[in-house]
Structures are given as structure tokens and as C-alpha cells.
UniProtKB/Swiss-Prot annotation:
Xref: CDD domains: KH-II_30S_S3
Keyword Cell inner membrane: no
Keyword Metal-binding part of the UniProt annotation: no
Highest taxon listed in the record's lineage: Eukaryota
Subcellular location: Plastid, Chloroplast
GO molecular function, one term: rRNA binding
Subunit structure: Part of the 30S ribosomal subunit.
Entry's Gene Ontology cellular component terms: chloroplast; cytosolic small ribosomal subunit
Keyword tags: Chloroplast, Plastid, Ribonucleoprotein, Ribosomal protein, RNA-binding, rRNA-binding
Ranges where the KH type-2 domain occurs: 43-118
Pfam families to which the protein is assigned, alphabetical: Ribosomal_S3_C
Official protein name in the record: Small ribosomal subunit protein uS3c
Length: 218
């Protein structure tokens, strides 16, 4: 049987960089990981609660965390930053307070900055959120996958593969359906592959969405 591996972890150090940049003693490492998870969850929850974009897409590509002894630098890569940049100082300040409360670390300085993603639909997280929104609105999963591929083609990618698994269209038996457009060379290490795994809750149950996007070859 074929052994599956996460395409991002497989390419770390070649075409993929770490999203968390910090060092810690082995005995304190788990605390740093938990802290990162709290920061990411807090930001995602805040954006989700305050989102007013009609598409329902949060547009968070990824969140990068850099830590020094007394400073935590958080960079949010957003596809649709209008929401946070409209009332920028107020919203970012509010977000900073929320994160600091969650971490309970008033002795360390927290900086949050926003970077706009030029081609949002080149990022599988943004695309997965779009598909999840369509499925929640009871759009057929095949239509949702087709529309997602069309959006990606506008971003000049070389290939995309989308897989949705679960009780599709409310059927009794769960199954997995996938579609591929272009090339997606998962075995080639120098191929820059963007990947995400996303869970969406629908009225029929939980569906899993996986997206692989072949961006370029280095």
C-alpha cells in the first residue's frame, strides 16, 4: 500500500519554510507549541466572529510566529485584509489584547502585523474555506470543486487536486471523491506544493477537505 505523508513536512528545508521561528530548551518545548496553537486559534476565532465579507471566506493563508526572549512577533497572511485594515489600529489593538489575555503573558511585548496575499486562491486554506462555505449552503460538492478549480486557474498555478470525503450530498455511506486538473507531482521534492487539510461541519455530518496546489518547480 502507498504510504501517505504530509507534503509540507516532506519539503521542509527545500521548498517549504517553518511557520514558527523560535528556540527552546527540550523540557520547555511543549509549552512553546501550546502557545503557538493558542495564538493561531485566538486569531482565527476573532476573524471568524467579526467577519463581514459576503463570501464567508476568512482568507487566512497562514500565520507566522517569531519569538525572542521578550517579544512575540505575529505575521498574519490574509487574502482579504479589508476587514482588519478598515479600522486598522482599533481592530489590531483589540486582537492584541485578546491574544495577550489568552496567553496570560503581560511581561512580553506582542506585535501583530498583516501581510496581504497577492493571489489568495493560490493558497489551499483560502480555497478550502471557500469550498466549506459552498457545502454549508448545500451546493453540490462537484459544483463546489469545479468552481474552486476555476478560481485557482485564474492564479496561474500548474496543477490542483481537491478531495472531499464523508457523507457527500447526505448519502448514507461515506465515501471520498477527488478531482485533479494539471500536474501535481507529490513525489518530486523540488516541486513547490501548497497543501491543507480542512474539516467542515454540515447538516449531514463532518466532511474532510484536502487540497494540493502545484505552484512551481525550483
Amino acid at each position: 500500500m502507498g504510504q501517505k505523508i504530509n507534503p509540507l513536512g516532506f519539503r521542509l528545508g527545500t521548498t517549504q519554510d517553518h511557520y514558527s521561528l523560535w528556540f527552546a530548551q527540550p523540557k520547555n518545548f511543549f509549552e512553546g507549541l501550546q502557545e503557538d496553537q493558542k495564538i493561531r486559534n485566538c486569531i482565527k476565532n476573532y476573524v471568524q466572529k467579526n467577519m463581514k465579507i459576503s463570501s464567508g471566506v476568512e482568507g487566512i493563508g497562514h500565520i507566522e510566529i517569531q519569538k525572542r526572549i521578550d517579544v512575540i512577533q505575529v505575521i498574519i497572511y490574509l487574502g482579504f485584509p479589508k476587514f482588519l485594515t478598515e479600522g486598522k489600529p482599533k481592530r489590531i489593538k483589540e486582537l492584541q489584547i485578546n491574544v495577550q489575555k489568552e496567553l496570560n503573558c503581560m511581561n512580553r511585548k506582542l506585535n501583530i502585523s498583516i501581510t496581504r496575499i497577492e493571489n489568495p486562491y493560490m493558497h489551499p486554506n483560502v480555497l478550502a474555506e471557500f469550498i466549506a462555505g459552498q457545502l454549508k449552503n448545500r451546493v453540490s460538492f462537484r459544483k463546489a470543486m469545479k468552481k474552486a478549480i476555476e478560481l485557482t486557474e485564474q492564479s496561474n498555478t500548474k496543477g490542483i487536486q481537491v478531495q472531499i470525503a464523508g457523507r457527500l450530498d447526505g448519502k448514507e455511506i461515506a465515501r471520498a471523491e477527488w478531482v485533479r486538473e494539471g500536474r501535481v507531482p507529490l513525489q518530486t521534492l523540488r516541486a513547490k506544493i501548497n497543501y491543507c487539510s480542512y474539516t467542515v461541519r454540515t447538516i449531514y455530518g463532518v466532511l474532510g477537505i484536502k487540497i494540493w496546489i502545484f505552484v512551481d518547480e525550483e
